[in-house]
Amino acid sequence: MSFISEFKEFAMRGNVIDMAVGVVIGGAFGKIVSSLVGDIIMPVVGVVTGGVNFTDLKLTLKEAAEGAPAVTINYGSFIQTMVDFLIIAFCIFCVIKALNTLKNKLPKEEEAAPAEPEIPADIALLTEIRDLLKK
């Protein structure tokens, strides 16, 4: 089997395609949440906290010099990213909780009792002989 045909077989499996769709949708969802946080939630939080723009919050370690930018720790961007993460984690939690609730409400299939294995002929014959000797 050639390398190309093996790759084609691998890529066309259902699980790989499902995973690819999930990654694309997850990326789009992440962009939506980032926009929600950056454009809607954080400005409101900034107004509530006295007009603070979180993306401008930073700690300057070294001032800018000729030809070199300032060295800063941008903790405001980190706060915004943490809010993104919390919203995404909460949404995923809600989806999983809803799926588990639906899964628990569906009637469970009763497991069939395992069939007794067929007794080999020699064992059946020995059992018969034992029973006859007991009489």
Curated annotation (Swiss-Prot):
Record-level Gene Ontology MF annotations: mechanosensitive monoatomic ion channel activity
Q: Which UniProt keywords apply?
A: Cell inner membrane, Cell membrane, Ion channel, Ion transport, Membrane, Transmembrane, Transmembrane helix, Transport
UniProt signal peptide? none
Q: Where in the cell is it found?
A: Cell inner membrane
Q: Which Gene3D superfamilies match?
A: Large-conductance mechanosensitive channel, MscL, domain 1 (1.10.1200.120)
Q: Does the keyword Membrane apply?
A: yes
Q: Where are the transmembrane segments?
A: 10-30, 76-96
Regarding the membrane, this protein is recorded as: Multi-pass membrane protein
**Is Transport set as a keyword in this record?**
yes
Q: Which InterPro entries match?
A: Mechanosensitive_channel_CS (IPR019823), MS_channel (IPR001185), MSC/AndL (IPR037673), MscL_channel (IPR036019)
Q: Which GO terms describe its cellular component?
A: plasma membrane
Role summary = Channel that opens in response to stretch forces in the membrane lipid bilayer. May participate in the regulation of osmotic pressure changes within the cell.
Spell out the subunit comment. Answer: Homopentamer.
- HAMAP family registered for this protein in UniProt: MscL
Q: Which family does it belong to?
A: Belongs to the MscL family.
Name of the protein: Large-conductance mechanosensitive channel
Q: Which organism was this protein described from? A: Campylobacter concisus (strain 13826)
